[in-house]
């Protein structure tokens, strides 16, 4: 898939189509970590900034922010937000880019492409762009959460006296792909193959990319992020994405 064309096509309906991590973060975990890394003397990059949803969090907390994205149309939307200390650059984060060394990088649901090695390239670019001692926050989908949500769906049907084998396969279409794909965390979301990660995989992959993982934490969402009309009895544990806090040593 041509990523640039894909995101330029989605740009007009981006806010409606793309899940908003910031608005959906139940416990405001992202805000906590942004506060932790705030330093108005530091410079930051938003890796895959889209139309600038993170800018209101980053702009007040850093001296300068560079927003990088593959989509020219999304960058036009981001430019309209008019943050004085933010500049924008079009670029493919899977390729070698000439980016300034910075103290902080934020990367939200970008290293999620169906080609596993391409995601490794993105994470390596994060490492290359950080100064020694610089930190990154990386948000990526959880494979454990995807499997857990499927189990919750089966449990829901059981309460309505429907056996697992009687559930329409469309209900868990994301996990109906090839076994080898699912084992690699490649799951279909609305027809788009998306890379999901286990916690242990994160530790291995980031270490191989020469990033030291400091913390892996859940960003939890309400059940309506998974199901159209979840029952009221369905409470915590909630579905989640992973937030990876890491440092270049």
Labelled PLM ranges:
Residues 1-39, 41-48, 57, 137-168:
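Conserved class I S-adenosyl-L-methionine
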Residues 51-95:
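Class I SAM-dependent methyltransferase SAM/SAH-binding core
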Residues 106:
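A conserved beta-strand element that flanks and buttresses the S-adenosyl-L-methionine
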Residues 114, 185-201:
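Acceptor-substrate binding/catalytic loop of class I
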Residues 120-132:
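A short glycine-rich, Lys/Arg-flanked "PGG" loop and its adjoining helix->strand segment in the class I
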Residues 229-249:
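Core SAM-dependent methyltransferase catalytic element
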């Amino acid at each position: 898939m041509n990523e640039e064309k894909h995101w330029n096509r989605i740009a007009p309906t981006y806010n409606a189509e793309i899940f908003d991590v910031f608005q959906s973060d139940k416990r405001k975990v992202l805000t906590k970590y942004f506060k932790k890394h705030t330093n108005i003397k530091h410079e930051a990059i938003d890796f895959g900034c889209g139309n600038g949803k993170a800018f209101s969090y980053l702009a007040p907390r850093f001296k300068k922010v560079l927003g990088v994205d593959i989509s020219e149309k999304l960058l036009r939307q981001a430019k309209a937000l008019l943050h004085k200390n933010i500049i924008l650059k079009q670029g493919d984060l899977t390729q070698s880019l000439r980016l300034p060394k910075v103290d902080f990088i934020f990367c939200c649901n970008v290293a999620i492409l169906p080609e596993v090695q391409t995601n490794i390239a993105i994470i390596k670019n994060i490492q290359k762009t950080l100064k020694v001692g610089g930190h990154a926050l990386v948000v990526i989908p959880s494979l454990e959460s995807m499997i857990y949500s499927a189990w919750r769906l089966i449990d829901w049907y059981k309460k309505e006296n429907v056996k697992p084998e009687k559930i329409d396969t469309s209900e868990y279409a994301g996990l109906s792909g090839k076994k080898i794909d699912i084992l690699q965390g490649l799951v279909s979301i609305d027809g788009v193959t998306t890379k999901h990660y286990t916690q242990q995989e994160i530790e291995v992959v980031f270490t191989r990319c020469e990033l030291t993982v400091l913390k892996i934490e859940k960003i939890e969402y309400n059940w309506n992020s998974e199901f159209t009309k979840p029952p009221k009895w369905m409470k915590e544990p909630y579905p989640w994405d992973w937030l990876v806090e890491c440092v270049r040593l």
